[in-house]
């Protein structure tokens, strides 16, 4: 029970930090999504690296992390945040967050589909209500005029992708790589930073942050894109 209580508190702490992700993302301004993802994860990775070294934990532990854990962790971190910042920059923040934050409902749904698990009527009702609300929002606002490109459509698709990626990661992380230590998150963050910066160089126009945007990026890396992941993995 004590261990479960600590895990619950860690999860609540992570969710509290993630509540800062949107306002800090808005404060960072129109920084290209891949660049913003790369910079924030570089800060988060260096934070984890510093803590690991301060505790005397050898960096060689990262080399023993199985390939499937690397693929799952880096894929989820990279995909979720690139889509998150894309949604936040192309949609009103409230609309984006309403869809993105469907991930807890999807965790309930995906968990119930696993072997030895089952969905109760209350679970299905809650999931249906959440999805119906999101569908009403999308159908009401995301329908563009015929033949007219609509950045908002990209934003809604990005937000839906966020919800699917993070719920899938949360379920699979416990099922497939539960024995991987939390120190692996440091490697995931650093690898995500490198991958995101490479994607920025290849796919995005240059657009460096200015002024107070750097403070927002630092805060993102230390909190929602740093400490939050170590708490969630716990």
Regions found by a protein language model. Name each.
Residues 1-44, 144-175, 194-195, 215-216, ...:
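Glycine-/small-residue-enriched transmembrane alpha-helix faces in small-molecule transporters
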Residues 7, 30-79, 104-110, 164-169, ...:
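Transmembrane alpha-helices of multi-pass small-molecule transport proteins
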Residues 7-11, 64-72, 119-132, 178-189:
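Cytoplasmic-side transmembrane-helix entry/capping segments in multi-pass membrane proteins
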């Amino acid at each position: 029970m004590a261990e479960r209580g600590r895990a619950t508190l860690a999860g609540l702490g992570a969710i509290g930090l993630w509540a800062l992700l949107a306002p800090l993302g808005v404060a960072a301004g129109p920084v290209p999504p891949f660049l913003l993802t790369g910079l924030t994860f570089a800060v988060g990775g260096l934070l984890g690296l510093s803590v690991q070294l301060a505790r005397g934990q050898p960096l060689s532990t990262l080399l023993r992390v199985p390939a499937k854990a690397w693929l799952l962790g880096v894929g989820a971190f990279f995909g979720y945040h690139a889509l998150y910042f894309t949604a936040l920059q192309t949609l009103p923040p409230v609309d984006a967050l309403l869809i993105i934050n469907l991930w807890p409902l999807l965790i309930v749904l995906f968990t119930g589909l696993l072997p030895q698990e089952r969905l109760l009527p209350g679970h299905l009702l809650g999931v249906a209500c959440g999805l119906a609300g999101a569908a009403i929002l999308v159908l009401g606002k995301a329908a563009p005029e015929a033949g007219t490109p609509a950045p908002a459509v990209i934003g809604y698709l990005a937000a839906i992708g966020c919800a699917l990626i993070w719920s899938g990661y949360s379920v699979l992380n416990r099922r497939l790589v539960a024995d991987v230590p939390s120190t692996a998150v440091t490697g995931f963050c650093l690898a995500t930073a490198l991958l995101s910066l490479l994607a920025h160089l290849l796919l995005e126009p240059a657009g460096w942050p200015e002024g107070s945007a750097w403070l927002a990026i630092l805060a993102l890396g230390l909190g929602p894109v740093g400490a939050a992941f170590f708490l969630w993995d716990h």
